[in-house]
């Protein structure tokens, strides 16, 4: 029985609950471009469209003006769908081999999730990873203690992934949620925040644990306040374009947001 007006929280995976800094996908994108076409992209370029499904992500990287320029210089044309297919084909086995190495939960994530479960709040999740990558990640994350009630991968639904609301709404259906206004979507990337808005949910962006700050956990721990502030502001500038209801540093700060949304729902507010 729930003792909260919040029915469900839907979490992203990498950079939100596992894989501090969202390094599993970014490093693999760099490697996949190299392996598929002997073409160099840097980590910043690989991070730029994070949150999209991986095929769409590769397409978006190819459309970054600087990447498109270098691609044209090397191949005499812009990237085609066939090129994207080839890079995606290189990406998949690399990602499956590496994703388990980046399954460590982010600080306090398990405690926060278990606290939500104790309140009777359901835990949904969705990811920009395709199902065959999630099939590797889910059991490893479970060994660490992370067991969401439902998981949607970016290629599970024929309608597609983010920024459309379909993955979030699939969670709503499968978790038997009766009101999208009683749901919270938590993500470290803009497309996932947009997904939450499009699904009619409260949205929470993460500034320091995810893709936009791009810090390893070790860098985060060692950083002085000036370094953290610079990373925070870099992420804030990107995420504010999606107008999240809340911006917090990491999942460790989420319980205060939950308490505030509970108060607002009780007062009749809606997202």
Swiss-Prot record:
Keyword terms: Hydrolase, Magnesium, Metal-binding, Schiff base
Sequence similarity: Belongs to the HAD-like hydrolase superfamily. PhnX family.
Reactions this protein catalyses: phosphonoacetaldehyde + H2O = acetaldehyde + phosphate + H(+)
GO biological process: DNA repair; organic phosphonate catabolic process
Protein name, entry field: Phosphonoacetaldehyde hydrolase
Record EC number: 3.11.1.1
Cofactor field: Mg(2+)
Note describing how the cofactor binds: Binds 1 Mg(2+) ion per subunit.
Organism for this UniProt entry: Vibrio campbellii (strain ATCC BAA-1116)
One annotated GO molecular function: magnesium ion binding
């Amino acid at each position: 029985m729930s003792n909260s007006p919040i029915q469900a929280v839907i979490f992203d995976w990498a950079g939100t609950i596992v894989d501090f800094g969202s390094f599993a996908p970014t490093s693999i994108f760099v490697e996949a471009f190299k392996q598929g076409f002997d073409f160099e992209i840097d980590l910043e370029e690989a991070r730029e469209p994070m949150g999209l499904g991986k095929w769409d992500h590769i397409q978006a990287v190819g459309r970054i003006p600087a990447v498109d320029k270098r691609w044209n210089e090397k191949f005499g044309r812009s990237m085609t769908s066939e090129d994207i297919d080839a890079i995606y084909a290189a990406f998949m086995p690399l990602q499956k081999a590496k994703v388990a190495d980046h399954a460590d939960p982010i600080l306090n994530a398990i405690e926060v999730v278990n606290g939500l479960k104790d309140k009777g709040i359901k835990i949904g999740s969705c990811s920009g990873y395709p199902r065959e990558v999630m099939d590797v990640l889910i059991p490893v994350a479970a060994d660490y203690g992370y067991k969401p009630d439902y998981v949607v991968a970016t290629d599970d639904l024929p309608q597609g992934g983010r920024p459309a609301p379909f993955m979030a709404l699939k969670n709503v259906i499968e978790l038997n949620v009766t009101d999208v206004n009683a749901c919270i979507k938590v993500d470290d990337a803009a497309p996932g925040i947009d997904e939450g808005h499009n699904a009619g949910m409260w949205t929470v962006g993460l500034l320091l644990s995810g893709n936009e700050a791009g810090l390893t956990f070790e860098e985060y721990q060692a950083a002085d306040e000036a370094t953290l502030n610079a990373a925070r502001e870099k992420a804030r500038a990107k995420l504010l374009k999606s107008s999240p209801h809340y911006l917090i540093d990491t999942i460790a700060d989420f319980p205060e947001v939950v308490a505030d949304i509970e108060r607002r729902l009780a007062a009749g507010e809606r997202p």
